[in-house]
Amino acid sequence: MIDIHSHIVFDVDDGSKTLEQSIKYLKEAKKVGVNKVVCTPHMSRDNKEKALKIVKNFKELKKEADKIGVELYVGTEIMYKENTLKLLKGRKITTLNNSKYLLVEFKRGENRNFENIINALNDFLDNGYIPILAHPEFYINYRNIDNYRKLKENGVLLQIDGTSLINKSSFKTRRFAKKLIKERLVDFVASDTHCTKKRDYKSLKKAYDKVKKIDKNYANIIFCENQLEIVGEIWKDQL
């Protein structure tokens, strides 16, 4: 499996706090069959000091990951703001593995018109980026499947969290995540690990096994194959 959403770089956001904690979860990742991880610490604004710290801690963690046998890639999870596109163009925040793909989220709980979200994501598309909307199952104000059909028609990709498919999330979150899976609207399932028991790599493996029982081919596509466009390699079925 390949994980494109993780908060495993230590001491840079609300994820891992220490190098030791990150190493522990990378070992868990390797044990359950995750051999590539895109690191996506939170970023939303031009913060040179934080950016430098992310690079420094990423490099330190990568040395340890190489020993474990997990390849790390750099990226960010972007909290959308009005100036996000400008920051991307100015290279103040980064895409996933310096590709055309970007992982973006919107503030939860905001009573924002969904058309505004569509327009924001279309702006990325119009400028040559491919936006991946992080965990749409969490947006309680927009749990209308037609919203996401429209996004997909426009070229937006969807990433749900593995925990949203098992008993580590609310019933309504699980129900909507499963509906997205049933409708084949999901492009990626990721850990969104914060190096906690609630969001860990065992949960991602359980989610994979659950989808595999429904459709093995689709499970491989959304847990393994689509991710290769980001890390740039050819998938060999190892599961």
Show the residue positions of the predicted features.
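Non-catalytic positions within long, well-ordered alpha-helices that form the structural scaffold/packing
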Residues: 30, 125, 181-182
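Short, acidic/polar
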Residues: 18-26, 84-89, 114-117, 176-177
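Short acidic/histidine-rich active-site segments
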Residues: 185-201
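Hydrophobic "anchor" residues on beta-strands that sit immediately upstream
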Residues: 1-3, 37, 101, 131, ...
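Active-site beta-loop-alpha junctions enriched in small/polar residues
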Residues: 7-9, 42-43, 75-81, 107-109, ...
